């Protein structure tokens, strides 16, 4: 759809996070060696940037004023190796670009990233690709911008029940690696589990799906949340974004239950408004 890119950019500025934050639970506090400071921040002996555990989801959302979507770059699907970044015609991302975005008034950036072409036969993500993703994240993070990092044009997580076990294992493996790499980052880094998981090229692609597809998406959301939380460090408290089937605002997203509910939000976009505008000029 020609309006999808605009919708994605608008979505990045409107991080839809629901629920209230809460302090670190006793259940999670005994195994990591992390220190919860008297001001509510978390540190792990100095290597991690302090995570504000007192920050609620609604407070974080309010602090995100306007966001910018770095599209058609790390989410591109052409090229090989690091040339994937420029395979759709955009130049390589530079610190100057991100500085210009901040200077224009943006305080959040979404970094859509396609990992599929960078995963080896053994399931390991290319170290070079991980390093480049981290470098771009750091361009914004070091400017105290919020950064939303996701898995984007992945062909392998179409939510069919007979593929759920295989997809869930791969999703968990990928997010475990990503989360481990970024576990010391504070609340300015947000993970978005999937982008528009759906049955592609079917009658169910964009109409809200069916019970099977929606159920599998919710199970995959749980796998994502559990994988990130299990890596420990600041990922125990990280704000996570899950999406419903096809990221459709008419669907409901699910995750792993009450214990996780205080630090995740639903990422949706509405294309109907764009379609209506296009029809009526």
Question: Model regions: which residues?
Answer:
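Bacterial signal peptide processing site
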Residues: 23-25
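An active-site-proximal structural segment forming one wall of the substrate-binding cleft
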Residues: 89-108, 119, 123-153, 157-193, ...
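N-terminal carbohydrate-binding accessory modules
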Residues: 30-108
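C-terminal motif of bacterial Sec signal peptides marking the signal peptidase cleavage site
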Residues: 18-21
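Solvent-exposed loop/turn segments at secondary-structure junctions
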Residues: 72-76, 108, 115-119, 153-157, ...
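Hydrophobic faces of well-ordered beta-strands that scaffold small-molecule active sites
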Residues: 66-70, 109-111, 147-149, 191, ...
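Active-site region of glycoside hydrolase catalytic domains
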Residues: 169-281
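Bacterial N-terminal signal peptides that target proteins for export
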Residues: 1-10
């Amino acid at each position: 759809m020609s309006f999808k890119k605009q919708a994605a950019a608008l979505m990045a500025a409107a991080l839809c996070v629901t629920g209230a934050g809460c302090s670190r639970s006793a259940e999670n506090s005994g195994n990591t060696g992390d220190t919860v400071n008297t001001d509510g921040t978390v540190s792990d002996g100095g290597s991690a940037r302090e995570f504000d555990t007192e920050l609620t989801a609604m407070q974080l959302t309010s602090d995100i004023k306007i966001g910018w979507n770095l599209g058609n770059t790390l989410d591109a699907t052409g090229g090989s190796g690091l040339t994937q970044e420029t395979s759709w015609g955009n130049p390589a991302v530079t610190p100057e670009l991100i500085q210009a975005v901040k200077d224009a008034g943006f305080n959040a950036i979404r970094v859509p990233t396609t990992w599929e072409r960078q995963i080896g036969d053994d399931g390991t993500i290319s170290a070079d690709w991980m390093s480049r993703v981290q470098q771009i994240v750091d361009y914004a993070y070091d400017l105290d911008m919020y950064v939303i990092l996701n898995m984007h044009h992945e062909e392998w997580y179409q939510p069919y029940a007979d593929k759920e076990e295989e997809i869930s294992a791969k999703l968990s493996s990928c997010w475990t690696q990503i989360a481990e790499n970024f576990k010391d980052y504070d609340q300015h880094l947000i993970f978005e589990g999937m982008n528009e998981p759906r049955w592609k090229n079917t009658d169910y692609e964009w109409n809200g799906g069916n019970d099977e597809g929606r159920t599998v998406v919710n199970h995959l959301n749980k796998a994502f949340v559990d994988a990130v939380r299990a890596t420990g460090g600041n990922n125990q408290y990280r704000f996570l974004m899950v999406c419903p089937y096809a990221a459709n605002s008419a669907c409901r997203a699910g995750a792993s239950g009450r214990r996780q509910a205080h630090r995740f939000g639903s990422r949706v976009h509405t294309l109907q408004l764009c379609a209506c505008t296009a029809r009526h000029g």
